[in-house]
Amino acid sequence: MNEPVTKELVIHKIKHNLRRLRTAIKWIIFSILSGLLIGMVGIAFYFGMTWVTDTRTAYPWLIFFLPLGGIMIILLYHLLHDEKDTGTNLVLSAIHSGDEIPLRMAPLIFISTLITHLFGGSAGREGAALQLGGSIGNSLGRLFRFDEKDKHIMIMCGMSAAFSALFGTPMAAAIFPLEVVSVGIMHYSALVPCVISALVAHGLALHFQIAPPSFAILDIPEFGISSAVTVTILAVLCALVSILFCISLHYNEAIYRKFIKNPYLRAAAGGCIIILLTLLVGNQDYNGTGVNIISKCFDGTVAPEAFLLKIIFTALTLGAGFKGGEIVPTFFIGASFGCLFGTLTGFSPTLCAAIGMAAIFCGVTNSPITSLLISFEMFGFAAMPFLLLAIAFSYMLSGYYGLYRSQKIMYSKFKTSYINKQTH
């Protein structure tokens, strides 16, 4: 039976809808503000990264100062009383458990990532962007006296804005913070704020002529049973590579800490190891982000050992205490491994490079929807069936490993059961 319409009911519904409207207006305003402010910081970080990368490329001897750069980073964190920095893990933890993110994280990760890349450490930039955005977003939430739950949304807004400004993929940037924190549960309450923040930051980046990444897949075969089987095999292998990368990152850090207790000596030793490896390899292809090597993979040319060397260089760099992200190295590993698989099997090396990037990104972040969206933004829609299949298998078979130890897997990857466990 329908509820009788009374004056009190009408007033209640009007008040309820006005509250919704007020909430919507609030988040439109604050997400635009977040997109503008954090987008500008992300753009400054992009140009800083471009400058240090160009400088290191022009003066390759700068790598010999990498141990000194590591000592500078440790000293910087010590001076600002952040010796126990946990990076992106702290940002994720702040969203699902309410941990506080200090504003000093933003300048610390900004400067220390530039130092790492200037002197040739192997790291990315998007992980740093997540810390930048999360730190500033949290501080904006405090400034405007938001309650704990609204502050969590501001953190996610900041992550979206920084990721979008720096990487140029607003769809993936909007969804990633919603998906990565608690795998199996999407924080849809932050959807509109994150979308607006990502689009505003992306618009700013385009205004400053920051081109989004785009890779052309030269040969896309017809999708059928044979090609589906080949892609499934590649996806299974990518899941294994993603596990290897996560284990390498976590265990390298543990080994450094076990054998070298002093953080200054640890950073200096790590820098010396990277210098030695660079000299042994004979080039600097595995230092920095390696974006140029990713582009080569889409020309169908890559050294067979490239993905393994990038895993080693990145794990040794970040484990020693240098700063940066893990996402661009993940793309490097995925593109080079996929290209190698395609070359060995004769199955479109450029398509396999794209599949490798998407599948390994999914395996290490446990974020299949973001992986699919970022694939569409980087490669277009033509390879959709291949990417969709590979991402699905990589998500399932990568198990409960992940880049971020504070990430929680809320629901099993194999059954419809609630497990609430942290990645390892």
Regions found by a protein language model. Give the residues of each.
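Alpha-helical transmembrane segments and immediately membrane-proximal extracytoplasmic
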Residues: 1-424
